[in-house]
């Protein structure tokens, strides 16, 4: 009997061990698949464009950029450093893969899968680490109702909200991240000493001061004034996408780039049309915004290094900054196009996607120039339309009224107006008429590049709205038999105009309920979208940049 019990116990232990091994193998396979969604891609830049002093500046800025990585990691989740330390110390192969994906995602939450945890079971707080994890919208709003004098600091882009006893308090970034920002400030001042260009030197010194004062206005103005410079850098807290509770709080990032002078000169013509583009918006004149500055420089650059918010998950193609409406009113905004990132994404992602989702006879219209020009017009379109608005007689900003819906609505608007303005450039004779089909078709292929990022993410959600709206209104057709999609060129412009009007009026009126309804109705994973996305499983979702400077 005793022998039988021993044998049964051993069989039970063996069975449990086998199951555990199978589960572990499945976990390893799953993690490797997640990592393989991002194609490792070397990002090089032309060293010959830099003189010896500029090379020193770039190296210093690279050191400062790495601090932005650490700051953003802290902003994403309160336990990020603890988790990373545990994974770094582990010798378990599963933890090694988990760490690799953690580094891509800047935390244990899968940005491609609605922020579901891939390590541990805790859900990601909507407010990331900008607010107490248990803070609700209701509690935040009630606090402001009872403490109206706190509104400005609590809704500031550059404060974190913390509990102190039974109270809530807004802590400036300069205090909350004092150690890191003091170090970054020092490095920027060191870099400024080697900067030959006076405008770059001025920006670096003012941005260094801003890290300590928490006032970024003067340094944003100085960034807009950069002139005849080779090094194009932006560093600090900018985008609010990570704050899904209110879209109030700015995340730290850095774009370290060098200017491509020949390509930049080619695009100078477009900035002359900004006022005309505003006039051409499909909304009543009373809602058009002619008070923004019109300097609006456009730069084509090679990215040397990206850090923080811009590097988490999906890589940025271009940016349009600053976001401060006061700076935009005075000077406009700067559009910066990352050409080497565009080239990598077109080759590895966009064209292979087009081959799988588009009707074969429309594939001929997918071109790199249409892809690049759409990104340009997308960024220019961020600077168009309502900014400061009046709601119930009170002056406010679109982003404050639309709250957590703002990022998705704004990205959707920029993509819709990106097409609208490319078509306008045909009317103005800047582009030839034969580019029209390229504009429509290349964008449609690009929709499926974006929605793979997850429709809970601002760009993916914005593109889902466009796809479903255009499909439902006859601008796109889905062929069930071939499982492909196509543009109905004769219907597309009218449908585009209607959606542009709806988005712009939501912004002009600060219509929070209208924004929520549009997102609920159209930012959905519709049947045809599911089928088409399923076909793309054999392709990477994005690139995983291996920056030459970081090797």
Where are the regions that the model predicts?
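Long, well-structured alpha-helical subdomains associated
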Residues: 419-516
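Fold-level signature of zinc-dependent metallopeptidase catalytic domains
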Residues: 31-59, 151-408, 412-415, 420-424, ...
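Positively charged n-region of N-terminal signal peptides that target proteins for export
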Residues: 1-4
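Bacterial signal peptide processing site
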Residues: 17-19
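N-terminal helix-rich structural modules
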Residues: 23-195, 199-203
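Extended, compositionally biased alpha-helical segments that mediate assembly or anchoring
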Residues: 492, 496, 500-551
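Sec-dependent N-terminal signal peptides
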Residues: 6-8
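C-terminal motif of bacterial Sec signal peptides marking the signal peptidase cleavage site
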Residues: 12-15
């Amino acid at each position: 009997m005793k022998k039988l019990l021993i044998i049964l116990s051993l069989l039970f232990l063996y069975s449990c061990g086998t199951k555990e091994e199978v589960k572990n193998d499945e976990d390893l396979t799953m993690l490797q698949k997640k990592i393989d969604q991002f194609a490792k891609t070397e990002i090089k830049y032309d060293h010959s464009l830099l003189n010896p002093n500029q090379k020193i500046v770039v190296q210093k800025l690279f050191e400062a950029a790495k601090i932005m990585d650490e700051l953003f990691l802290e902003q994403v989740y309160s336990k990020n450093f603890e988790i990373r330390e545990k994974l770094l110390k582990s010798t378990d192969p599963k933890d090694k893969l988990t760490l690799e994906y953690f580094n891509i995602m800047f935390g244990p939450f899968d940005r491609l899968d609605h922020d579901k945890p891939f390590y541990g079971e805790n859900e990601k707080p909507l407010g990331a680490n900008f607010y107490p994890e248990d803070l609700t919208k209701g509690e935040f709003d009630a606090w402001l109702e009872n403490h109206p004098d706190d509104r400005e600091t609590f809704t500031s882009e550059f404060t974190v909200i913390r509990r102190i006893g039974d109270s809530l308090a807004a802590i400036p970034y300069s205090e909350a991240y004092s150690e890191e920002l003091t170090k970054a400030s020092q490095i920027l001042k060191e870099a400024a000493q080697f900067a030959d260009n006076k405008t770059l030197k001025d920006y670096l010194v003012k941005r260094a001061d801003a890290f300590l004062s928490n006032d970024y206005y003067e340094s944003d103005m100085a960034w807009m004034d950069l002139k005849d410079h080779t090094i194009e850098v932006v560093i600090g807290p900018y985008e609010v996408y990570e704050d899904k509770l209110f879209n109030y709080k700015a995340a730290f990032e850095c774009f370290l780039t060098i200017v491509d002078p020949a390509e930049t000169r080619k695009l100078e013509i477009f900035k002359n049309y900004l006022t005309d583009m505003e006039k051409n918006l499909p909304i009543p004149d009373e809602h058009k915004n002619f008070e923004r500055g019109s300097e609006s420089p456009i730069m084509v650059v090679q990215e040397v290094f990206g850090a923080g918010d811009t590097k988490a998950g999906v890589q940025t193609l271009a940016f349009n900054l600053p976001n401060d409406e006061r700076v935009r009113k005075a000077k406009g905004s700067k559009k910066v196009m990352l050409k080497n990132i565009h080239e990598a994404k077109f080759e590895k992602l966009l064209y292979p996607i087009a081959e799988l989702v588009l009707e074969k006879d429309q594939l001929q219209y997918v071109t790199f120039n249409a892809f690049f020009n759409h990104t340009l017009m997308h960024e220019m379109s961020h600077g168009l339309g309502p900014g400061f608005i009046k709601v119930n007689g009170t002056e406010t900003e679109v982003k404050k009224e639309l709250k957590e819906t703002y990022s998705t609505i704004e990205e959707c608007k920029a993509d819709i107006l990106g097409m609208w303005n490319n078509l306008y450039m045909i009317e103005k004779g800047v582009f030839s008429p034969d580019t029209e089909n390229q504009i429509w078709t290349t964008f449609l292929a690009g929709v499926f590049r974006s929605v793979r990022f997850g429709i809970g993410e601002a760009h993916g959600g914005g593109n889902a709205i466009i796809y479903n709206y255009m499909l439902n209104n006859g601008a796109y057709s889905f062929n069930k038999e071939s499982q492909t999609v196509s543009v109905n060129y004769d219907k597309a412009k009218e449908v585009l105009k209607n959606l542009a009007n709806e988005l712009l009026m939501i912004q002009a009126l600060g219509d929070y309920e209208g924004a929520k309804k549009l997102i609920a109705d159209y930012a959905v994973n519709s049947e045809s979208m599911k089928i088409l996305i399923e076909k793309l499983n054999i392709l990477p979702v994005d690139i995983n940049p291996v920056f030459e400077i970081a090797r």
